[in-house]
Amino acid sequence: MGSGFSKFIFSASNKQINRAVLSDLSRLFTRNPVYYEILIFETMQKAAKESVILTENVYLESQFLQREVCIDFFFPATVSTEEPVSLLLINDGQDMEKMNFHKILDRLYSEKEIEPLLFVAIHAGEERKMEYGTQNHLDYKDRGAKAPLYTSFIFDELLPFIRQKYSIISFKEKAFAGFSLGGLSALDIVWNRPGEFTKAGIFSASLWWRSVDQNDEYYDDDKHRIMHQQIRNGKYAPWLKFFLQCGNLDEIKDRNKNGIIDSIDDTLDLIKELETKGYDRERDIYYLELADGHHDVFTWGRAMPVFLKWGWGIK
């Protein structure tokens, strides 16, 4: 890993610091502009020293998506530039601030609980339901039409950008995570590009994604849930591992009237497909079910440390 990560050094002086500090310092500016600038600089240095996580926000122009993509980068400040680093891509990156992701990482790295990772949180665009989904199959409402373009953005624009910007030739490993529809997207990309990844982390994923309306008389769970079909018809990649999280309060729908909400049913059925494909429940799959978990950022934030320690925990 090259010197590109030196660019992170003062990015700890990000939105969180600006909100907390600049309002208090602004009144000094009119009296002593030089002092004001020095004080800001010293505050930034102090914040950078206190936090073990460095951040950077960038905007990447995508030709595939025809939009500017907002991306947040998170990286542990204490990592040597010679250490191999893993990459975790995260869909719905706009939720990281609400999740207090920075604080989650601060605690995990302060307590030396996880290995070095570069976290890349990709903000969703206005056409989220078109860009996320399954790249080879539209759902019954033709949603997910831009999922192939989103996949191209990841591999042909984002990954080359990361390698160039931070002087990283190769990563120790790559993983993809996401929430709700972003979880479906992450799993779909990992499953269809297994040579690029080692892990998928899906939180309350939209595994109901189907090719036929459930109210259609011909609808059949076994035939029309798209991701389940992809796994059933796909190839076994023995190095892949899967983290799946659900909450008992994710929703109230129970389409087959078996007393189990659809979110959990769909996830457990997907695990069965993975096991049938050859994945071991103990070695390759981690299922986390939160009894009081909702379909919200707070719940996913509670599950996030479990996911990170499962995937990259220091033994």
Task: Describe the residue ranges of each PLM region.
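Positively charged N-terminal leader segments that act as targeting/secretion signals
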Residues: 1, 18-27
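Helix-centric, low-specificity signal for extended rod-like, repetitive segments
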Residues: 9-12, 20, 24, 288
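Non-catalytic cap/lid and distal C-terminal segments of serine-dependent acyl enzymes
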Residues: 36-315
